[in-house]
Amino acid sequence: MNFARDVVDAADPSALALVERARDGRRREWRFAEVAEGAARLAGWMRARGVGRGDVVMTLVGNRPEWVMAMVACFRLGAVVLPCPEQLRPTDLARSVGVVSPTLVLADPRNRATLEAAALGCPVAYVDESGLFDGPDVAEAVTLRPLDPCLLTFTSGTAGEPKAVLHGQRYLAGQAVQAEHWLAPARGDLVWCTAASGWSKSARNVFIAPWLRGAAALLHDARFDPAARLELVERERVAVLCMAPTEYRVIAARVPLRAAPALRGLVSAGEALNPEVLRIWQQATGLPIRDGYGQTETGQLTGMPAGGEIRPGSMGRALPGTRLWIEDGELVADPATVPTFFLGYLGADGGGEAPGGPWRTGDRVREDADGFLFFEGRTDDVIISAGYRIGPFEVESALVEHPAVAEAAVVAAPDAERGSVVRAVVVLRSGFTGTPELARELQEHTKAATAPYKYPRVVEWADELPKTASGKVRRAVLRDSG
């Protein structure tokens, strides 16, 4: 098996693969023949520089065709690709390199300053360099097995450093299940998954799942603008729109909604959507938002099927063939029935193979009489904000590096648009006073120390943090007090 050969090379060469809408307004259509050739030549270029089967290639490129071709080139060689979000700071990138030891980094030139500050100590190439996508060498696709590694994605833990989740080739082929039963594009459709490159949802839904169904993918490399988002859906005749819950909420609150002639499907995943947002979108477009659920480690587990019964607020039922159950309020999965289940973790916070036996998701879920599942929250301390999963340890570590901070604890606070935001409870050192100016200073300090989406939008002061007898912070007390 090889995704590059079996899907990209095997497609109709003249069929539409990508529609590129660049930041500068440029528009270009990419046929499968162009994508296949560009990826094959990039694979040849990488092979000549020592990249081979099992080697790690890190990408720091936005939602551009160059990112897609870099992914396909890695699949072609049997290399393992780690797509990184462009929001990462130098410290984040350096930490990632320390965990995965990449053979090569492929980057957008706009990220040059970040990479130079990170001083990664490994080869870096920029996607605008001559010869990467039009060089003389073409690499043939190697034959791979389902458990051969292909993809890495970092996930935030509740303590310690983030872990790198390693997926096998089966992860790519396994997307066929959710592509058919949840995303559900038809052959020739245009699908727009707005997830930024580097996030687990982007790896599967920006182009992999659409291509498995014979659909094309829209790539829009620009910041989120609610009005521009709707205009582009109409202009490009998007058939299936996949957005984060926060994006649906913001658009519903800020832009007059209207039906788009070609739009047939709205899907979302990452956190629950409130009933009012669901109502506004359905009333304006005539379409329900079909929710789904998955994790970095598992891929998609549930979904509201196209054409099936819609249960507002539900994340659907288990995908066909996937066995799920609830144990003490927690959703549990049988890995043997999950075709996209991960191979294991890399990193100091949990190396080795995936744990055997049932997979405990750490998510509290309830099930109604008809088998529809409803998300109720996390059993651990991970914060889900605007679809981002944020581990409190990283934010706390950044805060305590500030000279004014003696201790800090981070929990989730409810937010109408983002679902949750990061709330920091801070104990100051002697001589410092909690003021709005200091709160803003701590926010800017955190943005500089780690990825900016992790900064605490709420900063509160406390004389001390609630702790257990052994000295552990009682986060549940802080959550309840918020």
Predicted segments, located by residue:
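Conserved ATP/PPi-binding loop(s) of AMP-dependent carboxylate-activating enzymes
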Residues: 317-321, 328-355, 390
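Conserved AMP-binding/adenylation subdomain of ANL enzymes
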Residues: 173-193, 197-240, 254
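Conserved AMP-binding A3 loop
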Residues: 29-33, 150-174
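Conserved pre-ATP/AMP-binding loop-to-beta segment of ANL
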Residues: 13-16, 137-154, 161, 184-190
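AMP-binding/adenylate-forming catalytic core of the ANL superfamily
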Residues: 88, 105, 241, 364-454, ...
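Gly/Ser/Thr-rich phosphate-binding loop
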Residues: 238-243, 252-310, 323
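Conserved AMP-binding/adenylate-forming core of the ANL superfamily
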Residues: 18-64, 68-72, 89-94, 98, ...
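Structural core segment of the AMP-binding/adenylate-forming
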Residues: 7, 48-49, 72, 76-134, ...
